[in-house]
């Protein structure tokens, strides 16, 4: 949204690519908005962001599915909580909410626990792919003149008369305005700039991802009644056809601790079994965890710092942050444009064209694609039917450092049953040929994850 203005914009990123951190590891849910406390910023941006997703996904070419959600009640004594959730959703302005009885729920989702007594149906709920959405937004910004600086963690911010001096990586940047959207580290950036004091506690959520063979066991996103720690363990299809279960909710201290644990995964299976008793454990293909930026104040902080002019925050953006992100970005961009008196960009490009997916093509489209570009005729990832042409395009379009996981997030190469066992080194070879990077410099996910070492190193 800020790229719609004539402002000069630089995105400073600590990691080697976009869509790192919490963006790549969350539930991928576009929430309807029934859960957030009425009157909070979480409630406001949830409902506003939800309404923006269909058009934004179409405009920028990332996946979105309006599959709806069910909040399940398994005990009659909990029915008042379900009805309270319905009333909260009405207060928040959520459309189409209805309470369904047992037979209606089971007709809609036959694989869930038959002990269900009722459910809140939220038809405006949806699912997306968070990293593809972020990549699409970043590419759109780049094609409209926004610059990116990677592997540049911010280490110092100095307030000057007409703005700020920011030290990031090995560079110094002078700017009139800062937007603090640093996720787990937003409290540290705020403190560095002399702004508001907030405390962000990482809240770990562990997930289990199942093969596409299990993807049809649920069509809607299935929640249990929420608790003070969050929306609980969900069972949901993904936009790519898998089945996802999780997350746990554990407050931790280490902002870099994304390790999965046996206890966490046991908790996911145990809790998810209440929703879906016959969990297809043989179809489990991977586990992962993500960290939510939980602000101890309990709500988002969006807007200009009350003490430091020119410092804007998107702080404490935990769930429903993915849903609210478009609305938050739009509002901040409009505020900054107004405050700086910047005109609109006259040649703004509205649409972004995604990589054409071979797996989604008809036979006729595949034949045409291969005739125009023979690389579309060579399969690199058998599990997800990803071609060499798609891998090459992903490499060309990467804004930061090219990595195996960066290609994976742009193409799904390595996201199937074998989790890259067949295609990982083939992707590395294509990166080597396309970029000239030595094989020992190519990493899976940045520093510390090299795939190859020099031969003489092995002999030491």
What are these regions (language model features)?
Residues 157-162, 166-246, 250-261, 270, ...:
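Flavin-dependent oxidoreductases
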């Amino acid at each position: 949204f800020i790229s719609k203005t004539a402002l000069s914009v630089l995105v400073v990123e600590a990691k080697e690519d976009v869509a790192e951190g919490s963006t790549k590891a969350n539930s991928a849910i576009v929430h309807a908005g029934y859960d957030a406390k009425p009157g909070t910023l979480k409630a406001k941006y949830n409902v506003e962001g939800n309404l923006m997703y269909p058009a934004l996904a179409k405009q920028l070419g990332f996946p979105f599915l309006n599959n709806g959600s069910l909040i399940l009640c398994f005990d009659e004594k909990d029915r008042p909580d379900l009805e309270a959730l319905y009333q909260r959703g009405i207060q928040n302005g959520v459309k189409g909410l209805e309470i369904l009885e047992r037979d209606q729920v089971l007709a809609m989702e036959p694989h869930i626990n038959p002990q269900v007594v009722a459910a809140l149906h939220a038809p405006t709920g949806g699912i997306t792919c968070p990293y593809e959405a972020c990549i699409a937004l970043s590419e759109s910004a780049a094609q409209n003149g926004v610059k990116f600086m990677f592997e540049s963690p911010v280490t110092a911010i100095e307030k000057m008369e007409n703005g700020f001096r920011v030290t990031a990586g090995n560079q110094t940047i002078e700017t009139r305005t800062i937007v603090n959207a640093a996720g787990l580290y937003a409290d540290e950036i705020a403190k560095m700039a002399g702004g508001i004091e907030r405390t962000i506690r990482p809240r770990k959520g562990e997930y289990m991802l199942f093969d596409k063979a299990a993807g049809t066991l649920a069509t809607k996103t299935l929640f249990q009644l929420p608790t003070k720690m969050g929306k609980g363990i969900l069972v949901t299809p993904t936009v790519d056809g898998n089945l996802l279960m999780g997350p746990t909710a554990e407050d931790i201290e280490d902002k870099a601790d994304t390790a999965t644990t046996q206890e966490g995964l046991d908790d996911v299976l145990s809790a998810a079994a209440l929703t879906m008793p016959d969990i297809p454990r043989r179809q489990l293909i991977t586990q992962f965890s993500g960290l939510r930026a939980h602000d101890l104040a309990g709500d988002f902080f969006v807007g200009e710092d009350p003490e430091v002019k020119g410092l804007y925050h998107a702080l404490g953006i935990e769930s429903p942050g993915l849903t609210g992100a478009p609305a938050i970005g739009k509002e901040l961009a409009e505020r900054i444009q107004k405050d700086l008196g910047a005109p609109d960009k006259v040649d703004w490009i509205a649409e972004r064209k995604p990589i054409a997916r071979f797996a989604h093509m008809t036979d006729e489209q595949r034949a045409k694609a291969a005739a125009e570009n023979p690389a579309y005729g060579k399969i690199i990832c058998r599990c997800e039917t990803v071609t060499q042409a798609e891998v090459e395009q992903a490499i060309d379009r990467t804004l930061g450092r090219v990595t195996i996981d960066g290609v994976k997030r742009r193409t799904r190469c390595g996201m199937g049953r074998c989790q890259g066992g067949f295609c990982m080194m083939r992707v590395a070879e294509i990166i080597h040929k396309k970029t000239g990077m030595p094989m020992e410099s190519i990493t899976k996910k940045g520093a510390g994850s090299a795939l190859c070492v020099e031969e003489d190193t092995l002999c030491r």
